[in-house]
Amino acid sequence: MDRPVTKRITVLTLQNIYREKGKIAALTCYDATFAAVLENAGVDILLVGDSLGNVIQGQASTLPVTLDEMIYHVCCVERGTHSVFILADMPFGTFQVSPQEAFRNAVRLMAAGAQMVKVEGGRHMAETIEFLTCRGIPVCAHIGLIPQSVHQLGGYKIQGKTPDGARQLLEDALLLQKAGAAMLVMELIPAALGEEITRSLSIPTIGIGAGAVCSGQVLVLHDMLGISSGTLPRFVKNFMAGADSIQVAVRNYVKAVKTGEFPAHEHMF
């Protein structure tokens, strides 16, 4: 059933879902038309992701995406919605130089309509996250596979497979929570590690290839609809298969996340 138009979901709403042991359903979104469809289908969070570099611009990575481009797409998504929560990626190069520069750039994303910004990186981003949160900007941290560091990581590979790697990611998560992160995205890590981190934190975790115990799930919209070029990653399910409309496919995704049916074993590492 479509969600009736109501006041916008807030950080407190997401925290209440988390405290009540509910699941948070998120999808990427880049324009007003899809934003309205996803909102009406019951998605909780629209992530205006720098993945637009891949699926909208045809880039080989997210690295070329600029702040102005992110602001444009945040504005588009905000105009198409009334109640869904809007999370925006801080693109490569906009938050790494200094906390002060990160704040200036985050302010522009918030002014465009974002309710929270997402920052990729581990413990080295704790100072920046604390700086932002102390100045009124909610932050979602992002650990595991961080696409903006794909060259440093040597490609799109599972992270945290070794005991040392797993321990570092758990420590990173705890440090970022302590710094003030209100939410944590975990990407491409073993399901057992995703569960350990989720149970160790008191903030929601959103998984993408991080197992089923996370507080919620996110997928790239184009992947979930089966319209991305190339082979879909293992952690993706094509919800368009068997659905007679995009609206139905998205509703099926939301239901599968909320009931714990997705991700299934075949989508985990």
From Swiss-Prot:
One of the record's GO molecular function terms: magnesium ion binding
Record note on cofactor: Binds 1 Mg(2+) ion per subunit.
CDD domains named in the record: KPHMT-like
GO terms classed as biological process: pantothenate biosynthetic process
Keyword Manganese assigned: no
Active site positions: 187 (proton acceptor)
Entry-linked NCBIfam families: panB, PRK00311.1
Name the record gives this protein: 3-methyl-2-oxobutanoate hydroxymethyltransferase
